[in-house]
A protein has these predicted regions:
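TPR/TPR-like (Sel1-like) alpha-helical repeat modules
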Residues: 122-145, 173
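Boundary/linker segments of alpha-helical solenoid repeat arrays
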Residues: 111-112, 139-152
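Bacterial Sec-dependent N-terminal signal peptides
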Residues: 1-24
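N-terminal alpha-helical interaction modules that lie
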Residues: 20-90, 144, 152-211
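TPR repeat positional signature
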Residues: 80, 114-117, 121
Length: 211
């Protein structure tokens, strides 16, 4: 999304520091499609939509990284998302809510859609829906936070896309004063964000190269 939402100071106090969990993508794929699994997609998405605060870190990990195995995701290049982005750029927040709800119903763990809805509910003073979606955002960004410590290539934070990387950087309060270097791997790209002696490693997963 070209028009990133820069209101994360509202979100930072909610950003968690949970236990690091090993990322097993094959196991996540298996669990999500197994109707008997506690981590079955339909079961998790029902909780995510209705009671996000009841979801634990392992469930959040399945929801975020499980996006890689879904075929029904909203694409940023699709006409529906472009229409939503245009409404957002025009500050038409009522229309953003209308369009955002439609895309959210199709792809509830889409960070861009959640962020636009958050901004729109903030502008329209809808505290209830704002609080609900901020809980969802916290879950998904915590899943990224718990995927590593970001201190080395081996322990890099892992994201599904470049777009999610920039959202995560905003949540981490990494500004434009950081420089980026990139390294291509067999299963993705590692970006090294550097400011002085501080380095943050973020890996963008390319699952078509893994499986």
């Amino acid at each position: 999304m070209n028009c990133r939402i820069l209101f994360f100071l509202l979100i930072l106090p909610f950003f968690g520091f949970g236990q690091k969990t090993k990322l097993d993508l094959k196991n996540i794929e298996k669990n999500l499609s197994n109707p008997k699994s506690a981590y079955n997609y339909d079961r998790l998405i029902f909780k995510f939509r209705g009671l996000p605060k009841s979801i634990d870190s392992t469930e959040a990990q399945h929801l975020y990284y499980g996006r890689n195995f879904r075929k029904d995701l909203v694409s940023q290049t699709g006409d529906d998302f472009k229409e939503l982005a245009e409404a957002f750029k025009s500050n038409n927040f009522i229309e953003c809510i209308r369009l955002g709800k439609i895309l959210y119903s199709k792809d509830p763990t889409n960070l861009d859609v959640i962020l636009i809805l958050l901004r729109s509910y903030d502008q329209t003073k809808d505290i209830g829906n704002f609080a609900h979606h901020i809980s969802q955002l916290r879950l998904l960004t915590d899943a990224i936070k718990n995927s590593g410590d970001g201190k080395s290539e081996k322990t890099a934070f892992k994201v599904n896309s470049v777009g999610d990387e920039y959202i995560f950087l905003n949540v981490m309060n990494v500004g434009q004063d950081y420089t980026r270097a990139s390294k291509t791997l067999k299963d993705g790209i590692v970006d090294i964000w550097e400011k002085g002696d501080n380095k943050i490693y973020i890996k963008v997963l390319y699952l078509d190269l893994i499986f």
